[in-house]
Amino acid sequence: MRDNLRQYRAIRDALTHGYPGEPTGRLAQHLATLAAFISGIVASKSTQLPKVASHVPGGTKPESRVKRLARWVDNDPITAAVSFCPSAQVLLAPLALQTLVLVLDGSVVGRGGVALMIHVVYKGRALPLAWLVRQGKKGHVPEALHIAVIEQVQRQIPAGAQVVLLGDGEFDGTTLQQTIQDYHWSYVVRTGSHITVRWDGETFRCETVASCITPGTLVELTDVRVTQEAYGPVMLLCCWAKG
């Protein structure tokens, strides 16, 4: 438990740096619980409350610690803006000295839910920066929510930082691409083979390019317009990896 206490204090002190002054009162209590939560998750390698609580330092009974964590999770005033964003900004400040690589991803959570998340890549790990959760299936999240979660992260990015956003095929909406362009970010997203492509005076489907390549081939088309709206110009890459 001594190691858990040392870890908890280190996490609490690091979280405190995200605030302009020393947190007091209710905010300090919430921050202490957040630090305990993070410390317990790291030590237990689990997000189940009983396992997390068993690694939270303190003289209270495990049942009391579980209730404390559960109350914190269910507390409506505990929002990402209050408890998470300050820490994310502290994390991003040193990382932004180099190009920030962000990953946009959708994951199934709970029963019938989907979480839309943006992570920053750091030493081979994806660290979450922002998320939205809704009922639905993966791949069926409206583009407006893609943009909403992008906007959450954009407010945390240090001014002047170079950003590259990576996304799967569900994130190729042209309104989302324009939003990313407006932020002066670079981006790479997959797209479907059915997408309409306009290049060099010709109009064809993306799968036409794919049918012309062989294993180990990379085709690069520049000054491309995509979809019926002719969004662009963008670069289109079509690759058939070996193996």
What residue spans do the PLM features occupy?
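Short, charged amphipathic recognition helices of the HTH superfamily
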Residues: 44-54
